[in-house]
Amino acid sequence: MGLPWYRVHTVVLNDPGRLLAVHIMHTALVAGWAGSMALYELAVFDPSDPVLDPMWRQGMFVIPFMTRLGITSSWGGWSITGGATPNPGIWSYEGVAGAHIVFSGLCFLAAIWHWTYWDLAIFCDERTGKPSLDLPKIFGIHLFLAGLACFGFGAFHVTGLYGPGIWVSDPYGLTGKVQSVNPAWGVEGFDPFVPGGIASHHIAAGTLGILAGLFHLSVRPPQRLYKGLRMGNIETVLSSSIAAVFFAAFVVAGTMWYGSATTPIELFGPTRYQWDQGYFQQEIYRRVSAGLAENQSLSEAWSKIPEKLAFYDYIGNNPAKGGLFRAGSMDNGDGIAVGWLGHPIFRDKEGRELFVRRMPTFFETFPVVLVDGDGIVRADVPFRRAESKYSVEQVGVTVEFYGGELNGVSYSDPATVKKYARRAQLGEIFELDRATLKSDGVFRSSPRGWFTFGHASFALLFFFGHIWHGARTLFRDVFAGIDPDLDAQVEFGAFQKLGDPTTRRQTV
């Protein structure tokens, strides 16, 4: 045929049997990738420290998606929440991976069968005997089945009526676990951080899909609408399908990047906005203040801060800190977190408490500036020593740690104080192991960042694909050069330009 690479899919344009075959093969490839990727991740995943080395720090991509749907245990005897687990049965991480691979193999065989036996009676129009698909009817069938699956997921899986429920956590990502969720039918169901909205929206959307599917199965489209939207053309199906996919991709890119109940921070890591807004820092200070109000000492109050909460308040877990093209997990960047050193409190020689100004997200370097409670600069690490007025040495800054491994330890040596002031720019201070993975010290993004970038990029690409194929199907007659109002019988091949009698070919 000699088709250029960008036109090879025309071979299935008027061949319903093989069009079905290539779609089944595509499903086989997707399911096969998912199962294989899950097995690879399980082979390299270390479940030993869910607090300081969670899945998102290790660069896991498919494990978080399995976990949010209710899978928490492995046939290897470990649980995602830590500790040993009894036999989880078929629906373990390995079981899900295996199910995808088996499904992929069955789809592979089905694709070969449909490629071989392409000329089936079901694809032929009874009146003409030629290949033909009733596309509005097929649309109704697919809408009905998709609605059924959507309703079933919301009504049974999410609610725990017949299924495990989904991953639910508190606003600070500390107490997450898989549990059943009751549908939220009030206005709170529209809050993207309320899990009940997932159940209610799937039930509502599924019901709508079922009803819409039945409508399209029982009601034929008007002739003008059928012709106007080119409902008889398979490229119309391609165009509208691409529209559905790119719209969904834009939506999930948003819910992933800005955060929602569907993207828990325990599974995908915190969002950049939680660093920008000091979200975890405020909660930590609130807990410390509450402890002091209960007559606890500063050391006791800080010691009660969960290590998990302190770890979220560290810039290395900000997905916007990693470059888009820096390959590898977060652990390959700043290293594997080993322990929280504690919260450093800086004071000048007059006893004023000083706060290190934190590094904004999009800075690689940032001046070390210490301010008092009123925001007045009291100390810094100067760029030019000759002009310094606020240097650590001149101001006499000391640091004392509360909570963590260095609880109660204080330093007055200027070099040590400056070292911890620099590290305090990055949030809470952690000991990081860079030797094990030969980590290079350059921040990496989390799976939250990769997912967002990938889906936003492909959504943009698919948007242009929708415009392209939509234009092709709507203006097919224009592109082909055939006048849609041409009444004369047209003989293909008789004219150089189809339907133009002034370009009749000359016989040799």
Swiss-Prot record:
The chain crosses the membrane at residues 21-36, 101-115, 140-156, 203-218, 237-252, 457-472. It comes from the Eukaryota. Gene3D superfamilies: Photosystem II CP47 reaction center protein. It is found in: Plastid, Chloroplast thylakoid membrane. One of its GO terms (molecular function) is electron transporter, transferring electrons within the cyclic electron transport pathway of photosynthesis activity. One of its GO terms (biological process) is photosynthetic electron transport in photosystem II. Keywords: Chlorophyll, Chloroplast, Chromophore, Membrane, Photosynthesis, Photosystem II, Plastid, Thylakoid, Transmembrane, Transmembrane helix. One of its GO terms (cellular component) is photosystem II. Binds multiple chlorophylls. PSII binds additional chlorophylls, carotenoids and specific lipids. It is a multi-pass membrane protein. Its main location: plastid. Belongs to the PsbB/PsbC family. PsbB subfamily. PSII is composed of 1 copy each of membrane proteins PsbA, PsbB, PsbC, PsbD, PsbE, PsbF, PsbH, PsbI, PsbJ, PsbK, PsbL, PsbM, PsbT, PsbX, PsbY, PsbZ, Psb30/Ycf12, at least 3 peripheral proteins of the oxygen-evolving complex and a large number of cofactors. It forms dimeric complexes. One of the components of the core complex of photosystem II (PSII). It binds chlorophyll and helps catalyze the primary light-induced photochemical processes of PSII. PSII is a light-driven water:plastoquinone oxidoreductase, using light energy to abstract electrons from H(2)O, generating O(2) and a proton gradient subsequently used for ATP formation. This is Photosystem II CP47 reaction center protein. It comes from Daucus carota (Wild carrot).
